[in-house]
Design a protein with these regions (language model features):
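P-loop/Walker A NTP-binding region and its immediately flanking N-terminal helices
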Residues: 1-178, 182, 188-190, 200-201, ...
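Extended, largely alpha-helical regulatory/partner-binding modules appended to the mid-to-C-terminal parts
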Residues: 151, 155, 171, 175-363
Length: 363
């Protein structure tokens, strides 16, 4: 039987040092332990797949670690039980399934017992799924904890759905989206450990597809490896086969043809991609809007190091060679809006692309 583990599980951090980004949040958790200032309740929030539950588990493991300095040791009996998922004092609850008031009341009875190790930590995953009655019962527990060596970690993608009275009793730990560069470096590290190679532009392209979610991108990496088969070198063809999206180099090729209004070059580029299995619907849905957005960012003077160019084009390349104006981009976008509906249900989508180019360059 296969021992395959998805990348997101295989490379899930087991120490604070392994967690990508979230430096301030990690420092708050670490300092609370070093300074012996127990956090009775924290609210960890953010989009899916950025490490909310992972950080909650690490904090729970840390407060019970026998050798904690700046990080967990992963060697003491408490850490070993936590790694095995059998720690008696770390209770993780799926609030989507256990969201009723009766469950919270039953939990309170369990919490009255003293922890076997140092602290008992309760992690409520997706806590916003709890019913109003369950939240009211939880509030009473937060106000009057049944035991002093007790901490609660509320994890959610939607904190506004929690009652204000609960939020007011929590230390907020908001997690931001991860930067594409951070995600790309993580993918590179994983590929090196797994014995794969990939062009940097492919890693950059993948890293921006997940919208800042590391788990989503790691799942895409698994799909990309499967699409590549036994090949150890991942290239742009694998990217198109798996997702129908363009790599950075292909964005550059498309940008050059749009910038110079080269209809032949645009048609040839798309013909090459279609022959490699690209879904033109995705090109319309993501490729063209992405480029138009990046053109607008640079032409408007809004580009800074903090604003990513989703296509992966460098600002200098666009500034030096961009012949378009903001008015041109506006016209391009209006034509794209008019032509895009024609693509759905089209028997020959490449003809719709050619129509788009003709209208684009004639105007």
């Amino acid at each position: 039987m296969s021992n395959f583990l998805p990348t997101a599980l295989k490379y899930r951090p087991t120490t604070f040092q392994q967690v990508i980004g979230h430096d301030v949040s990690k420092r708050i958790m670490i300092n609370s332990i070093l300074m012996d200032r127990q956090i009775k309740c924290m609210l960890v929030s953010g989009i899916r797949g950025i490490g909310k539950t992972t950080l909650g588990r690490l904090y729970a493991k840390s407060v019970n670690c026998d050798n904690f300095t700046e990080d967990v040791c992963n060697m003491c009996p408490s850490c070993v039980e936590a790694l095995n998922g059998s720690h008696p004092d770390i209770i993780e609850i799926d609030s989507a399934s256990n969201n009723g008031v009766d469950f919270v009341r039953e939990l309170v009875e369990i919490l009255r017992q003293a922890p076997l190790y140092k602290k008992r930590v309760i992690i409520f995953d997706e806590c916003h799924m709890m019913t109003p009655q369950a939240q009211a019962a939880l509030l009473k527990v937060l106000e009057e904890p049944p035991h002093e060596n007790l901490s609660f970690i509320l994890v959610t993608t939607n904190p506004v759905k929690l009652e204000n009275t609960i939020r007011s009793r929590c230390l907020p730990i908001p997690l931001s989206q991860l930067k594409p560069a951070e995600i790309a470096q993580n993918l590179l590290n994983i590929l090196q450990k797994e014995g794969y190679e990939a062009d940097p532009d492919i890693l950059h392209t993948l890293s921006i597809q997940g919208g800042g979610s590391l788990r989503d991108v790691q799942q895409m990496l698994d799909q990309l490896i499967l699409a590549a088969g036994g090949t150890c070198k991942l290239d742009s063809k694998d990217l198109r086969a798996a997702f129908g999206i363009l790599s950075v180099d292909e964005y550059k090729r498309l940008a050059a043809t749009l910038n110079s209004k080269d209809i032949r070059g645009s048609i040839n580029a798309v013909s090459d991609w279609v022959s490699d299995g690209m879904d033109l619907t995705l090109l319309y849905e993501t490729g063209v809007p992405t480029l138009l957005r990046d053109f607008s960012v640079v032409l408007s003077g809004a580009y800074t190091d903090k604003i990513s160019l989703y296509s992966g084009l460098s600002a200098d390349l666009i500034k030096n060679r961009l012949q378009l104006s903001l008015k041109d981009v506006k016209v391009f976008f209006e034509i794209w809006e008019n032509v895009f509906p024609m693509l759905k249900g089209a028997n020959r989508p490449e003809v719709v692309w050619q129509l788009f180019l003709v209208r684009l360059f004639q105007d």
